[in-house]
Amino acid sequence: MDCRGLLCGMGNTGSMTSADELNEQYDADGSVTQVPERNDEVHAGESAVAQSRESAVTIPAGTVVLAATPIGNVGDASARLVALLERADIVAAEDTRRLYDLARRLGVYVNGRVIAYHDHNERDKADGLLDQVETGATVLVVSDAGMPTINDPGLAIVRRAIERGLPVTCAPGPSAVLDALALSGLPTDRFCYEGFLPRKHSERVQYLRTLLPERRTIVFYETPHRIADSMDDLLD
């Protein structure tokens, strides 16, 4: 097909990682070597830097905060995300198990109340969370990976917060859409995001044909087990 499209494969970024795995690094040839232990002075210095960085992060009271989480690389977690995980009153997580896995890898203790907040319950839970915001609570919303609301939960609470006149902000970070776009080599001055393609071949082909007149760069999401078929359809 003639339309200029970019497929972004969405894999499982929430796998469990052991302490030993976190203490390994990959050489250029793909082999694994052990990271040398750092001395106490280095650890103390890093701890002081971390404390200074945390004190510089303001946690807004009475606010909904959408925070981006790492996509496969825990090193992409921002200082704001770390502080929010530690200090938010309520953490609304797409998958609580993955949240605690992320917190463990970051060395963070989640002090606030954690609730499951996903596609199947976000509309029902939005107003209850916003009632807490009205009392001054900081409600942190996180998805499994990337930015909430981008094919992830979060839209319902943002809409209701706007309707109720309550503040919403975000702690920016990784987003698969923008990462894929930046690395594609395709024009980025004008683009559109089309989310996931239809699962069935016939529906996918029909949908792609409607996009033929589109001259902007198009970004799609696709699952690993369907990405080859979708690429074939794009090339037809």
Language-model-detected regions and their locations in the chain:
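Glycine-rich, flexible N-terminal cofactor/catalytic loop recognition
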Residues: 9, 17-19, 23-118
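Conserved helicase motor
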Residues: 117-122, 197
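Short active-site oxyanion
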Residues: 85-91, 165-169, 217-218
